[in-house]
């Protein structure tokens, strides 16, 4: 059923607008239709007070935790949202799904706190969101830790109990390592399925778009000692994709304690990840340490 008026709390963001039918084929149908049309680049226009802010100023825009989606519903999950600005100038459209019906989640400036270095001008109702993050009780039952983040292009990342963020995943990589410019498909819309009261997982749908391809993604996210993402991805190319990275991972590495050639830095290491650990199709465990070569290298 659609969200009922008596379930919408003033503090929490409330889905609005007409309810539309939604199921697992809704986003794939949108992606197919999108791929049949010419690509339309998203607007990056922002008001002056947001257009050229610094990293520190962007971090000074905080979503109010007590305004989180599902905050008052007694569920295992809550959702908070990121503001547009800094590197994240393109807006994304957020939807909430409940009972097979979807409604758009409107932007409200009252859901955010703006630090003293920022000077919002009016309500700016058309600003919209840049992304979102999910929270769940990972490390103790009475606190909602950050579980995962979807922010920027098709990037997403997650963190398990007692750990810190490392690498990020990407919905799709196009032209990584090629001599020419890399293409960055972006998630333009998200649908958050309202989980059942006893649910131990949450489902997110995303619509992907870029000059070369449209796509539909379904993420079944299950927290625990190991945080698991079951991902269903369907791609609808507008043109041939000669170098597409499926299930791509990305991280940051400058140097490590054993790889300091040409480095004059007091820090022992600077990286988010220092290697790739994987299990291949034969069941072998493989460890590949990262390095920072002078030229781009490809490893098969």
Task: Please tell me what each predicted stretch does.
Residues 206-252:
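Acidic, contiguous internal or C-terminal segments within carbohydrate-active enzymes
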Residues 55, 89-91, 129, 187, ...:
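Extracellular structured ligand-interaction cores
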Residues 32, 36-178:
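Solvent-exposed N-terminal domain segments of exported/luminal and surface proteins
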Residues 56, 149-151, 158-165, 242, ...:
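A contiguous, surface-exposed recognition patch within enzymatic or periplasmic domains that forms
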Residues 11-22:
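Cleaved targeting-peptide boundary
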Residues 1-13:
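N-terminal export signals
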Residues 99-101, 194-198, 223-226, 238-239:
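A short, structured loop/turn motif at beta-sheet edges
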Residues 166-222:
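Extended, loop-rich substrate-binding clefts of extracytoplasmic carbohydrate-active enzymes
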